[in-house]
Each structure stands twice: as C-alpha cells, then as structure tokens.
C-alpha cells in the first residue's frame, strides 16, 4: 500500500472530485489547469486539436478535458462566440516553462496577439499550478480573473469539483458571481 493510501492527509481533497477520482500527480510532477478558448477558424476543432497538442507536450500528460462550452466574447463584443474548455495536466515542467510551451502551441495554431480581447484561433491560459501563487511580469497564477469568468469556472468545476483557488477559496463558491454570464455546454 502506498504512503498516500495509508495517510489520507497526503491526498488533498481539492484534488479529488465527487466520484473519488484523484488528480494528485506522481512524485516529481505537478498539477496544472489550463483554459482553452478559440473563436476563429472552426473553434470547436481548434480546441479539440489543441487538447491533443497539450497531451503531446514534453514532460506533461493530459489527465482530463472538460466538455466544450459556447460563450460570448469578453471585452470586444463585435466578434464570434468562443468555444472554451479546461484541461488538467500533470507536468514536470516548471510553471514558466509550461507557460512557454503553451505559447508555442498557440503559435502552432496561428495565434497572433493583435490587441487585448482580439479574436483568436487559440488562447491557452495557465490557470493553476499546484497550489502555488506566482506573481511575476510573465506569469500570474492563479489566473487573476479566473474566478470572475463562467467560461473558466464551469468547465473547471466539471473536471475538478472540489478545486480550490489559492487565495480565493473553493472555485464553486464563485459560481454565483458569474451566474449572469451565458454559457452553453456543447459536448464532451
């Protein structure tokens, strides 16, 4: 029997969903949650293909992918709706290296950073990395607005219902704050 099985305190409840499935990474690995979004060039296909690309990242393993969701754009409204999902990864990459790998995937999918809230072929955001709080010029984890966005919270809670946002508490506690944001589940 593993040390974790002998000592329930070593399996944090924030990593266990209601079905009892454990997202705790193996020793030497980290748990990261990544938001996926697209609203150009067949966005459903873009998000599905991007999830495949996440599964092929060096030193990383895709553990879970939420259903796809349709949401209205944030900021600049005169653009197509977004297709969104959230993925759980186990990774041996440090957070900054994982962020660089996500940027590389975005570039593979033709992402251009023209202006804030611009339409995009693919957007990948590192939401959470273990329970770390990182505030650097290149990376803020937890993502600073994740608790205010239905397109992040709803798919995140689908794959990790007990998830905690460091410094903010249970992700589920923020659902009332986003209840006015339209979100439509499309498929698994």
Predicted regions mapped to residue ranges:
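A structural preference for short, hydrophobic beta-strand core positions in alpha/beta folds
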Residues: 64-65, 185
